[in-house]
From Swiss-Prot:
It is found in: Cytoplasm. Keywords: Cytoplasm, Phosphopantetheine, Phosphoprotein. The modification O-(pantetheine 4'-phosphoryl)serine is found at S38. Residues 3-78 form the Carrier domain. Acyl carrier protein. Its main location: cytoplasm. One of its GO terms (biological process) is lipid A biosynthetic process. Disulfide bonds: none annotated. GO terms for molecular function: acyl binding; acyl carrier activity. 4'-phosphopantetheine is transferred from CoA to a specific serine of apo-IacP. This is Probable acyl carrier protein IacP. Pfam families: PP-binding. It comes from the Bacteria. The gene is iacP.
Amino acid sequence: MNMDIEARVKKVITSCIAVDVDSINGQTHLVEDLYADSLDLIDIVFGLSEEFDISCNENDLPDMTTFADICRVVKKSLESRV
């Protein structure tokens, strides 16, 4: 995975949820590990849309349960723009 994408995704997550950036790794689960609630998840989706200028909405949430999942969705969205 692109390290720039990972760093930017971490930035979005930590701006929406009060967690330490070092506590996030590929298998970090948003709900189980970071205790994100539904509003946090929506904030993350909209934050990703703004950060990466991609079309991302709450319909993408089922595919975005872990940090690695989020990075994959973002990367796929960025690649489809090209």
